């Protein structure tokens, strides 16, 4: 759980070894990192996250952890499992799809952009 705490509730809000971002995002990153009220709210969320053990979680659920065929779906890589708040895993998975959605203009041509973004939204 400590890795998850750091990656979600702590390290995004200051310069940390694991943080990497596109240079063009520097103004947005600086704004978020200097927002004291945002940091306070995140700390309230951290307290809720660490004190709520209502279900067993995967702990690192993202699109790379979901293996699908036409007939079945398997979830892999459970090594970060822990007890936590019920909505955490699905929230992480949805956020992974949303990050992919918003990053697509930097990765796709106009011809394929809208179709792929629509597909991502249809998954959610």
What are the residue ranges of the model-derived segments?
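Conserved protein kinase catalytic core
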Residues: 66, 83-85
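Internal hydrophobic scaffold segments of catalytic domains
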Residues: 1-11, 72, 87-91, 120-124
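Aromatic-acidic/polar surface patches that form glycan- and anion
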Residues: 50, 54, 86, 116
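Pre-DFG segment of protein kinase catalytic domains
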Residues: 56, 74-77
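ATP-dependent phospho-/nucleotidyl transfer catalytic cores
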Residues: 1-58, 69
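Active-site activation/catalytic loop segments of kinase-like enzymes and analogous catalytic loops
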Residues: 87-124
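Conserved catalytic-loop position in the HRD/HxD motif
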Residues: 60, 65, 77
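Activation segment
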Residues: 73, 81-83
């Amino acid at each position: 759980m400590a890795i998850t705490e750091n990656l979600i509730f702590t390290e995004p809000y200051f310069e940390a070894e694991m943080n990497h971002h596109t240079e063009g995002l520097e103004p947005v990153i600086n704004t978020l990192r200097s927002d004291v009220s945002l940091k306070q709210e995140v700390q309230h969320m951290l307290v809720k996250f660490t004190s709520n053990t209502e279900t067993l979680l995967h702990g690192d659920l993202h699109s790379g952890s979901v293996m699908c065929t036409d007939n079945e779906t398997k979830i892999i890589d459970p090594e970060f499992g822990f007890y936590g708040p019920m909505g955490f895993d699905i929230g992480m998975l949805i956020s992974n799809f949303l990050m992919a959605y918003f990053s697509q203009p930097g990765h796709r041509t106009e011809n394929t952009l809208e179709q792929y973004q629509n597909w991502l939204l249809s998954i959610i």
